[in-house]
Amino acid sequence: RKAILKQIKAALVPHLRAEEKIVYNGIYAVKDKEAKQDSAEGYMEHQLAEKMLVTLEHIDNAMSPEFSAGSKVLKEMVEHHVEEEESNVWKDVKNHFSSEQRVEMNKRFLARKKQVEPAAA
């Protein structure tokens, strides 16, 4: 279970950080109160997910009820976050950025994610 947690963290943290830097900061810069709210909510959800990862790392017994419960909470948080992104954040991106801007944003996201990966492991 700890090995799986390490893999989850190695995949999730670079994604979170790149998304915050490129997507959420981009959305937050537009003049749309609702889009800014969506961006702020996403950022807060990222912070909570990272805190849960740290909490799980500090539980010595990966077979304990605490580790199982924490893993379940993390899973539910990530699922909720993905649903919010699909219904709100990506709508905001589509509404406020041209196709060319979205392509550029994706390139910057992927580049940023690669920069974060070594530090997140």
Language-model-detected regions and their locations in the chain:
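Small-residue-biased structural context
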Residues: 1-121
